[in-house]
Each structure stands twice: as structure tokens, then as C-alpha cells.
Amino acid sequence: MKKLPFILLLVLCLCLCACTNEKAVPADTAAEITVYYSDENCENLLSESVSIPELSPENIMAALLEKGAISQSVSVNSFLMDKTGVIRLDLGKEFGGMISAMGTSGEYMMMGALVNTFLDAYSASGLMLQVDGKTLETGHSIYDFTLEFFPLEP
């Protein structure tokens, strides 16, 4: 009988020692990507490695905005990468309005920055782009084909 209080005290001590205030830390989900953007003269695409909280289309669009590759925030309606490595990206109407207002060089640089950044981030082979579920049409081009990596110098 004398052992029972000692055993109970020992069990209580072990239980209290196992309790801590530390919370489980989630695994680091940050991703390192290469963001492409235009030089000041809209003549060449430049690139820079940046860290984003996690690899997602929304975080990639935010990184493009931060580097000045796009001039305003753009919503991502949908994103899918098929078995062949082609990304199917549907952006909000703000992207269509923004790129349609560009000149030829500005459009090339913005499209190149977008396409190259996504292809590089996801190691994809191509990108099919839509705006609000429709083919993107600007004054310079109709983007009804799979876009591939843009050369850094046009």
C-alpha cells in the first residue's frame, strides 16, 4: 500500500513533464522561384530569384506584381497542369484589359514575363492562357495556342 502513493506521484510527475507550451511547427513551405520582368526600355527580359510563401499561381502573380512585370493585381480563376506538362491558366478580366492597353513591346514583355515565370516555376513545357474562360485577344495577337518559353532578348 505504501507503494501506491509513490507510483501515483511518479505517474503525475511524468505526465506533467511531458506537457510543454511548444506547438508543432509546420514544415517550411516557402518556395524559391525565378521571376521574369522587363527592363526599363521594354527591350529585354530580366530574371531574379525570389522567395514566395508557397508555390501557388496566386503567389506567382503577386511576385510578378512586386517585380513590376504586371501593373496591377490579377485574380487567378483556375490553374491546371495536365499530364503532358502544359499549364492551363485562366486569369481574371483585369489581365485582359491591362495587356490590351500595351503597345507591341509592352505586350511581348508582359506575356514573356508571365509565361516564363510559370513555366520555370512548375517545370512545365507550355502554357495555355485564357481570360475569364475565353481566348485572350489583344490588338496585336490572338493567344489561342500553347505558349512556350520566350527568349530573354526578342
Segments (PLM) and residue ranges:
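Bimodal "functional hotspot" detector
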Residues: 4-8, 18-154
